[in-house]
A protein has these predicted regions:
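Enzyme catalytic cores with a strong preference for nitrogen-chemistry domains
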Residues: 1-353, 369-378, 410
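ATP/NTP-dependent adenylation/nucleotidyl-transfer catalytic domains that generate, transfer
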Residues: 7, 23, 165, 223-224, ...
Length: 611
C-alpha cells in the first residue's frame, strides 16, 4: 500500500452448480490464497456461491437459504483476511429476487449491490429469474457479529479505506458493463476510482478480444482501475462454456489477464496515486450530486512486494510495430508544425546548425520533411556547419555528408577565428576551458545562424530536445534560442529511436550508413578540445545517463510522482543496470537541475507538442 500501490486479485474458484456449501469452501480457500499473495481487494465471479447456471433452481428456497448460509460462512472466514472481498449470490428482498455482489471485510458484511442490467437475448434469459436493480437505496437487517446490523442494499454504494487515501471502490455485475450506460460511469463520477465486476461471461469464438477491449476501454474512459472476475469451468455446460477470463486494467492498460480455460488467481498492482493524478489533470472530469452510501472498510497499513513492471524507456513503445508507428506519427507532427510556420511567415529558407550529433540530425530530417510537405525544394534548407575547438573529424564529416544526402544547401562557417577574437575582447584566456570558454562558442554559433537567417530571409530551426531543456543543458541565448524548436517536446531517448527509424526506412543506403554512424557517436556538445582526435566531452558523464533522466522526467511530468516513489520504481526497473546509490545520485542531480534551470525554459521559442 506504500506509494499508492495496492495489490488486487480477480479469482475464479472451482464450483459445483447449486452446491453452496462446497462453493463456500472453495471460495474461502481461494480467498486465503489471494490474501497470502498480498491482495487487498479480492473479486470473485457473478453468483459464485450458487453457480450462475442454476436456471430454475433459483426459485428453490433451499438454494436461496443455502446461499445466505454460505455467505455467512465466507464472512466469518474473512475475519482474519486483510482484504475487501466481493462474492456473488442471489438475494431475495421484498418479494423479489436479485443478483447481487456482497462486499465483505474483516468479518463484516458491508453492503449488497444488485445487478441493474439483466440480459434476456441470445443465450441469456436472466429476467426469468431476477429483478433489475432500481435506483433506490435501501437497507436490510442482517445478523452481525454482536448485534443486528442494517446493511445498504442498492447500486449507489462506494466503499472507502481511510488507511489509504483515495482508495474508493464500487461494484457492477457482468452485463452492467456491456450496455451503453454502465453503472460504473455514475460510480466513477461519484468518486469511485476502482470498479469491480463480478461476471459470468460465456465463451464463444472471438469474444475474448472484445471483452478485453471493453474492460480496457472502460478503465480508460473512467480513468480508473477495473477488476473483472469471470466464471469458469465449474459452471454447467448444458448450453454454454465459461473460460474464467479474468482481467485487471488501469486507465486503458491491461495489467494482467488469466490464461483462458483455467480457473486461477490473477493479481496486479493498481496505482491509486496515478489514477488520482490523471483525474486531477482532466479538468473536464465531471462530478455527480447523486446520493451515494459511503461505507468504510479498514486495511492494515503495510508494504507489499511490488510486482508491477515499469519500462526503462517510458517515452518509447516496447513493441517494434508500435514504435515504428509512433516514430512516423511524431515525425509527421514535427514536420507539419514546421511547415505551418514556414508557410505562415513566408520564409525563404530554413537555417539549421548541423553538428553531426543526434539532435541537429533530427532537426534536419524534420526540415526536409517539412519542405516536402510544403512543396518547396530541399535546397531552401541552409545546413550550417560551424567547426571550432571541439569539433572532431567524425562529426564534421557526418554533418557534411548528411546535408548532401538530404539535398540541403551546405554552408561552412569556421568560427575559431571569431571566437578567438571575442575572447581577446573580453579578456578570456583561451587555455582556460571554463564555462565562458564553452558558452562563448555556443553563442557565437547562434549569432551566425541568426544573421544567416536574416540574410536569406529565413528562420533558425532549434535543435535542443526536451531532456536537455529539462536539465538546462543548453547555453542561455546560445543553442537555447531559435525561431522554432522542432525537438522541444521530444526526449533524448526518443530522439535516438526517431533517427534510427529514419535510418531503417530510408531508401538511400549511404544516408542510412551516415545516420547509423551518428547513432553510434557519443552525445557531446563538442565545446572542449578533442583528445587524439576523439570526443573528450561526453554529456552523460557530466549530467548522467539520459535513460535515467528521461525515466525521472516522465514520472515527474506525466503523473506528478514524489521523489521517493520515482526512486523506488527506478530501482526496480533498472535493477542490474544501475545500483541504488547511482540512481539516487542522478535523481538528486535531476531535481537540482530541473528547478535551478527553470529560467531557461521560461523564455523558449515555440515548438510543436508531440506527446
Amino acid at each position: 500500500m506504500r506509494d499508492g500501490f495496492i495489490k488486487v486479485a480477480a479469482v475464479t474458484p472451482d464450483i459445483r452448480v447449486a452446491d453452496c456449501e462446497y462453493n463456500a469452501e472453495q471460495i474461502c480457500k481461494k480467498m486465503k490464497e489471494a490474501a497470502a499473495l498480498g491482495s487487498k481487494i479480492i473479486v470473485f465471479p457473478e453468483l459464485c456461491i450458487t453457480g450462475y447456471t442454476c436456471e430454475d433452481l433459483f426459485w428453490q428456497e433451499v438454494l436461496l437459504n443455502g446461499a445466505k448460509d454460505a455467505l455467512d460462512q465466507i464472512r466469518k472466514e474473512s475475519r482474519e483476511i486483510d482484504a475487501l472481498v466481493f462474492v456473488g449470490l442471489p438475494w431475495e428482498w421484498k418479494g423479489k429476487l436479485y443478483n447481487v455482489a456482497a462486499a465483505i471485510c474483516h468479518g463484516r458484511l458491508l453492503g449488497l449491490v444488485p445487478k441493474k442490467n439483466l440480459p434476456n437475448y441470445s443465450e441469456f434469459y436472466e429476467m426469468r429469474h431476477f429483478e433489475p436493480a432500481n435506483e433506490e437505496l435501501d437497507y436490510i437487517e442482517y445478523p452481525g457479529e454482536e448485534e443486528q446490523e442494517w446493511i445498504p442494499f442498492g447500486m449507489q454504494q462506494i466503499f472507502y479505506c481511510p488507511q489509504m487515501e483515495g482508495l474508493t471502490v464500487a461494484a457492477e455485475i457482468c452485463e452492467d458493463l456491456w450496455v451503453p450506460q454502465p453503472p460504473s460511469i455514475t460510480h466513477a463520477i461519484a468518486g469511485a476510482n476502482v470498479i469491480v465486476n463480478l461476471s459470468a461471461s460465456d465463451e464463444i469464438t472471438g469474444k475474448d478480444s472484445y471483452r478485453r477491449n471493453l474492460v480496457g476501454g472502460q478503465s480508460a474512459r473512467l480513468v480508473c482501475g477495473y477488476i473483472y472476475a469471470d466464471a469458469g469451468e465449474g459452471e454447467s455446460s448444458t448450453d454454454l462454456v465459461f473460460a474464467a477470463h479474468n482481467l485487471i486494467a488501469e486507465n486503458g492498460t491491461i495489467l494482467a489477464q488469466s490464461k483462458r480455460f483455467e480457473n486461477e488467481i490473477v493479481t496486479a498492482d493498481l496505482d491509486i496515486h496515478r489514477i488520482r493524478a490523471e483525474r486531477r489533470r482532466m479538468t473536464t472530469y465531471p462530478t455527480t450530486q447523486e446520493e451515494y452510501e459511503w461505507t468504510e472498510f479498514e486495511l492494515k497499513t503495510e508494504e507489499t512486494k511490488l510486482e508491477r513492471t515499469f519500462a526503462q524507456m517510458p517515452f518509447v513503445p516496447q513493441n517494434k510495430n508500435d514504435r515504428e508507428r509512433r516514430c512516423e506519427e511524431i515525425l509527421s507532427i514535427q514536420a507539419l508544425g514546421l511547415k505551418k510556420r514556414l508557410v505562415h511567415t513566408n520564409c525563404k529558407s530554413l537555417v539549421v546548425g548541423i553538428s553531426g550529433g543526434l539532435d541537429s540530425t533530427l532537426a534536419l530530417l524534420v526540415a526536409a520533411r517539412a519542405c516536402d510537405m510544403a512543396g518547396i525544394g530541399r535546397d531552401h534548407i541552409l545546413s550550417v556547419t560551424m567547426p571550432c575547438f571541439g569539433t572532431t573529424d567524425r562529426t564534421y564529416q557526418n554533418a557534411c555528408e548528411l546535408t548532401r544526402r538530404l539535398g540541403a544547401t551546405l554552408k561552412e562557417v569556421d568560427i575559431r577565428k571569431s571566437v578567438t577574437c571575442h575572447f581577446e575582447d573580453i579578456g578570456q584566456d583561451i587555455n582556460c576551458h571554463d564555462v565562458t570558454y564553452e558558452n562563448g562558442q555556443a553563442r557565437e554559433r547562434t549569432q551566425v545562424l541568426m544573421d544567416l537567417a536574416n540574410k536569406s530571409g529565413g528562420m533558425v530551426i532549434g535543435t535542443g530536445d526536451m531532456s536537455e531543456l529539462a536539465l538546462g543543458w543548453a547555453t542561455y541565448n546560445g543553442d537555447h534560442m531559435s525561431m522554432y524548436g522542432v525537438n522541444a517536446s521530444v526526449p533524448k531517448t526518443l530522439v535516438r529511436h526517431l533517427v534510427c527509424y529514419c535510418a531503417d526506412t530510408c531508401e538511400d543506403r549511404r544516408l542510412g550508413e551516415v545516420l547509423y554512424d551518428i547513432l553510434d557517436t557519443p552525445v557531446s556538445p563538442e565545446l572542449l578540445p578533442p583528445e587524439d582526435g576523439k570526443i573528450s566531452q561526453k554529456t552523460e558523464d557530466l549530467v548522467g545517463p539520459y535513460e535515467l533522466h528521461d525515466f525521472f522526467l516522465y514520472y515527474v511530468l506525466r503523473f506528478g510522482y514524489a521523489p521517493g516513489k520515482i526512486y523506488r520504481i527506478a530501482g526496480k526497473s533498472f535493477a542490474g543496470v544501475y545500483d541504488d546509490e547511482t540512481i539516487l545520485k542522478w535523481l538528486k542531480k535531476f531535481y537540482w537541475r530541473f528547478f535551478a534551470q527553470q529560467f531557461k525554459r521560461s523564455c523558449l521559442p515555440d515548438g510543436p507538442k508531440v506527446g
